């Protein structure tokens, strides 16, 4: 890296960015979602496994499929959000490693039962989901990540017959400041970190 980002960029990505609970009635074009993914894909994962799989739920029909899986507290805001990204992970991610990591037989590291790949898929897929939040902010979108849903119902509705499992959801769009809660505190360096 040649230089640090300026303060305005750091604010947009971290310091002044907020988890959004309400969004303006402003559509997010499919071209912007493609641009978003084209940033996310460059984020690092172990052995370039890139196990995350994304479904961008935008249509009324797809939202209706998602609705029964949502917790009560997440239902209304998700139905109103322009986009809900389902962040999934593919338990058969290793099948693409001959292409993604060709300089050694990385696929062999993960051969065997799917259960043995779950940890790597979840860990690296979660990284990619975090990259999605930051990439969305970098592109001028707001994000509202959520865990309150029934993964089995999401998997049945969107990933049936595949090796993909849902991890978490992220509402995307242009945030409505009226829906923000007061800013919550964060732990200080001394509370959360140490230098060994």
From Swiss-Prot:
Keywords, comma-separated and alphabetical: Flavoprotein, FMN, NAD, NADP, Oxidoreductase
Lineage top rank: taxon: Bacteria
EC number: 1.-.-.-
Cofactor(s) the record lists: FMN
InterPro entries reported in the protein's UniProt record: Nitroreductase, Nitroreductase-like, Nitroreductase_HadB/RutE, RutE-like
Enzyme class: oxidoreductase
Gene3D superfamilies, sorted: NADH Oxidase (3.40.109.10)
Single GO molecular function: oxidoreductase activity
This protein's record includes keyword DNA damage: no
Pfam families, sorted: Nitroreductase (PF00881)
Assigned protein family: Belongs to the nitroreductase family. HadB/RutE subfamily.
UniProt-listed PANTHER family: MALONIC SEMIALDEHYDE REDUCTASE RUTE-RELATED
Protein name according to UniProt: Putative NADH dehydrogenase/NAD(P)H nitroreductase Smlt0482
Annotated source species: Stenotrophomonas maltophilia (strain K279a)
Source lineage: Bacteria, Pseudomonadati, Pseudomonadota, Gammaproteobacteria, Lysobacterales
